[in-house]
Amino acid sequence: MLGNLDKYQIILASNSPRRKELMSGLGVDYVVRTLPDVDESYPADLAGAEIPEYISREKADAYRSIMQPGELLITADTIVWLDGKVLGKPEGREGAVEMLRSLSGKSHQVFTGVCLTTTEWQKSFTAASDVEFDVLSEEEIRYYVDKYQPMDKAGAYGVQEWIGYIGVKSISGSFYNIMGLPIQKLYGELKKL
């Protein structure tokens, strides 16, 4: 079903429980390695879709020196792109509240960069999804932030959580990309190996 994938030991280098959940849904055997501290800054001339792809390669490069032949490393990074600016993970409760206020009643893009790496080659790609939020009340925003603690999520929200149920008006593109891993696109790339 997945071509020559059985010749690789698949390693998901991620601290994200959502990426682990999505990988498990593919039904492939894989192991998880915790990400070391990786500098997630990026060159100022990058914009939008280029940013998470660049960071996913940086994450892969942090592992490259310890990789063994036969290993296939998967790294990813997700950003929310609103009005030409990156919304990464919020800093604290008030940062999350501010991000959700800025998303309320607007459309934005979610970009996830994915990097596939072996000792012999590296390939990266980006997926994009458009998300439109309904207008959120201050009460809804604060309820969500207090109950769901979205400080580990780009844009301060999980589309699969309460805020997605009540606030997401429309989506164009991959739902799973918004969760943090464009699993259909990843599956297509893995089939090519």
Curated annotation (Swiss-Prot):
Catalytic reaction(s) noted: dTTP + H2O = dTMP + diphosphate + H(+); UTP + H2O = UMP + diphosphate + H(+)
Subcellular location: Cytoplasm
Residue stretches spanning the membrane: none
Cofactor: a divalent metal cation
EC number: 3.6.1.9
Keyword Glycoprotein recorded: no
Keywords noted in UniProt: Cytoplasm, Hydrolase, Nucleotide metabolism
GO molecular function: dTTP diphosphatase activity; nucleoside triphosphate diphosphatase activity; UTP diphosphatase activity
Summary of the function given for this chain in its UniProt record: Nucleoside triphosphate pyrophosphatase that hydrolyzes dTTP and UTP. May have a dual role in cell division arrest and in preventing the incorporation of modified nucleotides into cellular nucleic acids.
Family: Belongs to the Maf family. YhdE subfamily.
PANTHER family recorded: BIFUNCTIONAL DTTP/UTP PYROPHOSPHATASE/METHYLTRANSFERASE PROTEIN-RELATED, BIFUNCTIONAL DTTP_UTP PYROPHOSPHATASE_METHYLTRANSFERASE PROTEIN-RELATED
Protein name (Swiss-Prot/TrEMBL): dTTP/UTP pyrophosphatase
